[in-house]
Amino acid sequence: MESTKKISLFIVVFLGLLTAITPLGTDLYLPALPIMPHELNTNASLIQMTIGIMTFGIAIGQLVGGPLSDSFGRKKPLIIGNILCVIASILCSVAPNIEVLLVARFLQGLTGSIGVVIAKAISRDFASGKELMRLMSLLMLVNGLAPVIAPLIGGQLLLFSTWRFIFIILAGFSAVLLIGSFIFTESLPPEKRISGGISIAFKNYGTLLKDKSFLGQSLVQLFAFGGFFAYISGSSFVYQNIFNLSAQEFSYMFGINSCGIILASVLDRKSVV
């Protein structure tokens, strides 16, 4: 049955921005990675870990954020998540050492991912069938474009600022999402909310972990994304330290590579019968 709710331009833009926060948080500061070890008196491996630990936070946040929104509605978890994401981003910008930065990056991923998973839930509140597919395709497009645009923006920011300013930009982006969360009208009425959503969700997670088919497919995804994130975390060091490219030149190379990934995804979908 098709949803009767009207999808406004605000909802479309808001959901797109919610979806963009995690790829922006991952890719915006990539051009700055090689200059960060010296400033924080640490090594490249620990700086690269700031990407991995944020990704871990994203994974945990999505496991919790979805059930929370099913139990308490979409609006409250969004507001709380975006407030905490603003704080985490500011903490990243003022981190005095690598230890504080790692903690802040984990919190940034944890809180930012709440908006990502709730954006998908809101999509289902407003649409179904083909309309839902079109809306989800739009959100996937945002997810695809963000890795192309983010390093380009980050590289240009480094022309007149430091890597710390990049996290201020992320804090500002989260603040915009926070304002949108206050404007957003709750899409899940109380009568449709699930009591004990978190406990039910974790029981379902336990069932999934016993499913061999699920585990097998998850391992395939794990290895695929493991290689992808190895490239993300190491590419800026290789391009800038070995090939002597500037931060801006690296961002162009990374953007071209991301375009290739998007093209491959499109061709892959068209090849499926």
Regions found by a protein language model. Give the residues of each.
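Cytoplasmic helix-loop-helix junction between adjacent transmembrane helices
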Residues: A104-L145
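Conserved MFS/SLC helix-loop-helix module at the cytosolic interface between two early adjacent transmembrane helices
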Residues: I60-E99
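Helix-breaking motifs and short loop linkers at transmembrane-helix boundaries and internal kinks
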Residues: N41, G73, V94-V100, T111, ...
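Flexible cytoplasmic inter-helical loops of multi-pass small-molecule transporters
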Residues: F182-G206
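Extracytoplasmic
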Residues: F10-A44, G65, Y231-S236
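Helix-loop-helix hairpin linking two adjacent transmembrane segments in secondary transporters
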Residues: P96, V100, G129, L135-F182, ...
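Residue-level signature of mid-helix packing/kink "hotspots" within the transmembrane helices
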Residues: D27, T55-L63, P147-V148, S258-V266
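Conserved small/polar residues in nucleotide/adenosyl-binding loops
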Residues: K270-V273
